[in-house]
A protein has these predicted regions:
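Thiamine diphosphate
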Residues: 1-178
């Protein structure tokens, strides 16, 4: 079987404020936003995706800077209709985020496939997916197969805990094994 390799990517300095307490979810968003501001090799290789939880898992600033992927350019309907929003959903061919809708199984299938890019095509992609941690179980078959194939990706389960009041009871982590 043919396998390719790609060089290790250098990681640029990431300035993380440590002078105050911050949630891991907010820190994750700040790290990606810091990377999105630059033009490092790492930042150009990151691909993010989520099953309809982009804003609530702190990917919003990354997506605003790096745009959403689409085969052809599409305008942001909220901007066109003058609907107030912190999201700037511009779809462009060079976009680095793929929005999946509510589809956790598709999230893990995509992460697994993109996580094999270095060995299949000789070019590394750094796939990062976010999901509400209580819904990870919806994609475990695909996650298992991706791991068997030695796919390289990052899955961020957030927000965790049992105090996510605005999201409702169905989004709590009470079923997550500890």
């Amino acid at each position: 079987m043919r396998r390719y390799f790609d060089a290790t990517l250098p990681v640029p300095r990431i300035d993380i404020p440590t002078n105050s307490q911050i949630s891991t979810q907010a820190a994750f968003g700040k790290i990606l936003d810091d990377l999105a501001k630059g033009d490092s090799d790492l930042a150009t290789r990151i691909m993010t995706t989520s099953p309809d939880v982009t804003g609530t898992t702190s990917l919003g600033p990354w997506v605003n800077r790096r745009k959403l992927f689409a085969r052809t350019e599409k305008a942001d309907a909220f901007i066109e209709q003058r609907i107030p929003s912190t999201a700037k959903w511009n779809f462009v061919p060079e976009g680095q985020h793929l929005e999946l809708g509510i589809a956790e199984m598709n999230l893990f299938l995509l992460l697994g496939a993109a996580g094999l890019s270095h060995s299949l095509f000789g070019k590394r992609i750094i796939p990062i997916g976010t999901v509400y941690d209580t819904f990870v179980h919806r994609g475990l078959d695909a996650l298992n197969y991706a791991c068997y194939q030695d796919a390289r990706f990052m899955i961020v389960g957030t927000p965790s805990g049992v105090t996510l009041a605005p999201e409702g009871g169905a989004h709590q982590s009470i079923a997550t094994p500890l």
